[in-house]
Amino acid sequence: MYSQQELDDAVAAGVISAEAAAALRAHVEGQRSIAIPDEEQFRLITGFNDIFVSIAAAILLFAVGFIGQSLGEAAGLTLDFKGPSPLAPPAVAATSWALALFFTAKRRMALPSIILLLTFVGGVLATTGFSLAMAVGTDALNHNNAIGGIIVAASAAVAAGAAWLHWRRFRVPITVAAGAASVSAVAIGLLVAVVGPDDKNLENIILGFLLVLGVATFLFAMWWDGSDRSRLTRRSDVAFWLHLLAAPMIVHPIFTLLGLNNGTASLSEGLVVILLYVALGVTALAIDRRALLVSALAYVLYALNELFRQFGAVELNVALTALVIGSALLMLSAFWHQARSAIVRPLPEGLRDRLPIVDRTTPIPATQPAG
């Protein structure tokens, strides 16, 4: 790509005319802002070097963790005999932070940054959990199951703090979702400690609470989305990861609490699954996020499979299910923008103003791919 100064020098040297230079500038500016429907772009890989660095970082972190575990075993710092050592995860977390200082802060590499963030927060979580478990003792854990919930909550709280520190230093979009997941784990851990692990209704209570947390995460994601309705900044990437977290937290409890996840779906239950999936599809179109559809895909595949089986297509039920769902999703993908316009435009203006803009412009840099 030629710079502005090089174009001016070419005009001064008589290589091209001033009119041609102006036309070239206008053409490039036009290419940088082409009106296309958003395709939920997010930056993950800019080249094979991202994959190369990610593989190398994973190998290094595995080695560091293995060495930490070996040192812990030699020093007798393990949970039970040959159990996990609290020396391994802090070594992984510290190494992840050190690597992020270069590959995230300086090189701005997307995929390695995501991996290093997850290993850092995971390392802090494991360090706190293993340390508290060792301090309490395995006997106390075995005789008082509520302590386990408290340890989970405390560990997740420290992990949430670590995610906040990482966000303050590196601003990796997925960090906010990692922090939200940690806060959710704190809430669930405290719930288990209060209700008691031996309660017969604990599973349903957790599922209901998880649904509430999922809705809260979804609303948090919508707040980030609402602050960047044109999806031009990092805030949109933050919202993407939050939606990816919220989707299974919403979908799994709904289908499980309705009894649609027990392997014995009836015809009516299968129809309920399909209707719920359609409702999720309308919501996904309205907010312009595909995560809800992906999270519920396994449930609707199972439901359609059961419907085809009950209608007598036993041998072809799997193939017919894949054919119907695959065709429907491809059709939706091809006409996503048109379908979204049909759903969003009739909405009240107050609600429409909170959703991503329908006809927005996605900027495309002239020298590199968008994302």
Task: Kindly label every feature range from the protein language model.
Residues 1-371:
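Alpha-helical multi-pass membrane segments and their bilayer interfacial helix-loop junctions
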